[in-house]
Amino acid sequence: MFKGFTSILVFSAGLAMAQKSPVSSVRLYVFDCGNLKSGNPQPLLDRGVTITDMSVAAYLVVHPRGTLLWDSGVIPDDLIKPGGTTEARATVFKTLKSQLAEIGYQPSDITYLALSHNHYDHSANSNQFAGSTWLVQRKERDAMFPATPPQNPNPNNARFSALKDSKTVVLDGDHDVFGDGSVMIISTPGHTPGHQSLLVTLPKTGPVLLSGDLYHYPSERTLKDFTPFGNLGDPQTEAASKAKVEALLKEKKAELWIQHDILAFGKLKKSPAYYE
């Protein structure tokens, strides 16, 4: 199931720092990075989506061999004010950095950074982790840092610009992060050229798959031809990725955590509590 090739590019940024505190087994922390209002809810309501607002999450995997931060929020920490900040359709009350600090970590303690994809609601604080080793699909990195930069770049791209010089592991498929099969990056292109999801096998909770934006709402798993944001990517490639993940969920008897599912996200325990 896990196939692909990995190559390593070493840039000028320093090596990632060692993990903060050794652990004997894998832990998964869930960070609340705010919520998003739907910009066009009616088509979603017409297809049976009852709540169109979306949660925004980031996750910290703590492994005996290091740490992995998965996604980095929707509004940069330095813009978050006491009482919360709203930017466009996003509202955030807690900084990512403060949630890390609450469990004893700072950005320099993060061994690896992996983004499900480059969109603004998953990458806002990426520059804080430029000293970590960045795990990214080749096609995603090429889209983020094209050989010929666009004349009118998205201003949100500045929020991950420091990753260009990070120590980088460039992926061409699935990737075993720590070498023991417990934390697997799963290549799921379609929503973006190098979109990826994350399978974490926890000793007590069991296997959990973090969706990224492969799914936004649970309805997508049962409604045919329902890709609410298909205009952003390649629907046919995304459909193949969904089939791959559904087969993987069945094979591993894994639980799917849809990162934007605001109802399911509300039921998850948040850091400083953790799953193990």
PLM segments and residue spans:
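Cap/insert and terminal regions of metallo-dependent hydrolase folds
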Residues: 76, 88-98, 199, 204-276
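Bacterial N-terminal signal peptides that target proteins for export
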Residues: 1-6
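Metallo-beta-lactamase
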Residues: 20-25, 91-109, 137-187, 234-253
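Active-site metal-binding loops of divalent metal-dependent hydrolases
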Residues: 33-34, 72-74, 118, 139, ...
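Hydrophobic h-region of N-terminal signal peptides that target proteins for export
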Residues: 9-18
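Active-site metal-binding motif and surrounding structural segment of the metallo-beta-lactamase
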Residues: 81-136
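Histidine-centered catalytic micro-motifs
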Residues: 113-123, 188-195, 258-262
